[in-house]
Every structure is written in C-alpha cells, then in structure tokens.
C-alpha cells in the first residue's frame, strides 16, 4: 500500500511539472510570430500541433497512472480486510481424505466436510441384516430460524441466517447399530461420537441465535428414502455456568446481587433469571439415502433437522431452528 501511495505522488508531481510551463507556450507564440514574418507558418504550425499532441499523450498517461495507483490502493485494502473469492473446496472421498497430510488439509475447509462416494448405486443396496454403523458424519449446509416476519401482521416464518461460527460445526465419528429389515426398512441408533457442536447464527435484523447442533441419542426408523427419529438436545450451558450476576444452576448466588430484601428476588418476573433450568429438550431429524456402495460399505444422503435454540438456562423462549445438510456413514 505504501508503494502504491509513493507511485501516486510521483505521477502527480510529474503532472504538475508538465502543466507548469505556461511561459513556454507564450514563447512558442512569439517564435511563431517571428517565423511568420519570414514565411515559416507551416513549420511552426507543425511544431505547435506536435507539442500539443505530445502534451495530451503525457497527460493521458498520467491520468492512467493515477487510475492504476487508485486501483492498487483498493486492491491492497481488500487484501488487508481479508476479502476472498474462493468457494468451498471440492468434496473428497473417504480414502482421498485419509491420504492427505495435516498440512494439505489445514485451512482448506476439508476437515469440516463429510466424505462423498465415487460411483455406487443411486438406491440403498444393502442386504437385510444387522450392521455396525461407523464414521457417521452430519454436515449442515443451511441454517434457518423461525422468527417474526419483517412484514406487519405476518406470521413467524423461517428466515435465512448468517453463520457466525467458524468451520467447526460438523458432527463426526458417530457410531451405533444399524439394522436393515427384510421389508427394506432401516433403523439407526446413535451411541457414541462427536455428536454435538455449539453454533451461533445471526438473523437479518441482527439478533444472534445460539444453539447446540446435535443428534445425541438419535433413534431413527423408516424406509431408506425417509427415516425419521427423535434425539436429545442438551442445555447450551451447563449447571455450573455463572451469568454476569454470579447466578448458576449448581453454584453461585441464588438471587441477583444488590436486590433489596423482602422476597423481591423470588418475584415471578425474576424467577426465570434466578432459577437456572438445565433440562434437555427434544429435536427431530429426517434422513434420506441418496447413494450407497455395498462393496465399500459406504452410504451418503441428505437430512433435515428441527430443534430448539438456546434458552439461556430457562430465561428465554427457545426458537425453532431448521438445519439442512448432507450425511455420510459406513456399515460393517
């Protein structure tokens, strides 16, 4: 950026030098008058035209240089602000991800993506039986929150949000029994893995909505093209979390500090703030298989989850959060 400023100043100084010699033009006119008396009008006219065209070319170059310098300044500002035109990385297969080193994956966004399948069948092609589900991965691609509409007298609707969390919201390494019945229906029960992730999104009006994206204790059943189940949504904050006034569920003050005595700390409007609620809630998810590969035991699909947001330990009414994305799993 400093080099761009220096180049701009240099060109501006050059432009001043070029425009300064007004006396040179008067001298040229006097020379033209003398030449006219000796019959040299044509040559002087050529000289004048040549000088004017050269001057126009030079000023044009100066103008272009100033534009280039301004563009360099704007480009430098974009670089400093961290602007990037790069999109999401190409989705890789499980084997391709495993073949990469840490430095090849670092900073690319691949670690936040679920693998895909190369080839395979467009349908669920696994035979009936009991399988061990491993390496299950749930990657959100869309977060919408049900909130009051911008239009007056309009009912609440799901609104698009802006993700405020870094690329750490994908659930991975989830395991559990997976059963395929003789009629083609499936059942999956989640037992272990990285099954929750704290996420914060921002509504168009600026309100931020934190929630715990999870599939904890999921029990989903149905046909491969749509099997649904409920799961547990733990409290966003634990019982030992203290609010700004030192109140907590299992520790801290019972009432807000500096409130007058006489039972005011237990008034109805303050109960939700004073009495912390860490009870879990329930969410629901629907999964669909889009491709399977029995040779490698891999299966992928899409999902749509509906769950409540954070309640600030019972002090706020939760919002409905709809999460859509893709999932991947291995059956052994």
UniProtKB/Swiss-Prot annotation:
Interacts with CV in the chloroplast thylakoid membrane and in CV-containing vesicles (CCVs). Its main location: plastid. GO terms for biological process: photoinhibition; photosynthesis, light reaction; photosystem II assembly; photosystem II stabilization. The gene is PSBO1. Belongs to the PsbO family. This is Oxygen-evolving enhancer protein 1-1, chloroplastic. Leaves. The lineage of its organism: Eukaryota, Viridiplantae, Streptophyta, Embryophyta, Tracheophyta. It is found in: Plastid, Chloroplast thylakoid membrane. It comes from Arabidopsis thaliana (Mouse-ear cress). PSBO1 is the major isoform in the wild-type and it cannot be fully complemented by PSBO2. It is a peripheral membrane protein.
């Amino acid at each position: 950026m400093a080099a761009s400023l220096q180049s701009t100043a240099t060109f501006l100084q050059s432009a001043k030098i070029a425009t300064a010699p007004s006396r040179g033009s008067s001298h040229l006119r006097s020379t033209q008058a003398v030449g006219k008396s000796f019959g040299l009008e044509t040559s002087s006219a050529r000289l004048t035209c040549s000088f004017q065209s050269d001057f126009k070319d030079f000023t044009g170059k100066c103008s272009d240089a100033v534009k280039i310098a301004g563009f360099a300044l704007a480009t430098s500002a974009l670089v400093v602000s961290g602007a990037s035109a790069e999109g999401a990385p190409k989705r890789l297969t499980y084997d391709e991800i495993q073949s990469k080193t840490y430095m090849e994956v670092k900073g690319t966004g691949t670690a936040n993506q679920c693998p895909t399948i190369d080839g395979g069948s467009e349908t669920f092609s696994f035979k009936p039986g009991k399988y061990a589900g491993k390496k299950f991965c749930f990657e959100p691609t869309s977060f919408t929150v049900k909130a009051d509409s911008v239009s007056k007298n309009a009912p609440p609707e799901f609104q698009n949000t802006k993700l405020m969390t870094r690329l750490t919201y994908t659930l991975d390494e989830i395991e559990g029994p997976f059963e395929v019945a003789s009629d083609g229906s499936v059942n999956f029960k989640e037992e272990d893995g990285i099954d929750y992730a704290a996420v914060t999104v921002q509504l168009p009006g600026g309100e931020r909505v934190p929630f715990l994206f999870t599939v904890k204790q999921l029990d989903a059943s149905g046909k491969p093209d749509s099997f649904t189940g409920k799961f547990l949504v733990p409290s966003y904050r634990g019982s030992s979390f203290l609010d700004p006034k030192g109140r907590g569920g299992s520790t801290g003050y019972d009432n807000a500090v500096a409130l007058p005595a006489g039972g005011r700390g237990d008034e109805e409007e303050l109960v939700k703030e004073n009495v912390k609620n860490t009870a879990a809630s329930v969410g629901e998810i629907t999964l669909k298989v889009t491709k399977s590969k029995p040779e490698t035991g891999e299966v992928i699909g899409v999902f749509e989850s509906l769950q409540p947001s954070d309640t600030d330990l019972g002090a706020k009414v939760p919002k409905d959060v709809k999460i859509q994305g893709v999932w991947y799993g291995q059956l052994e």
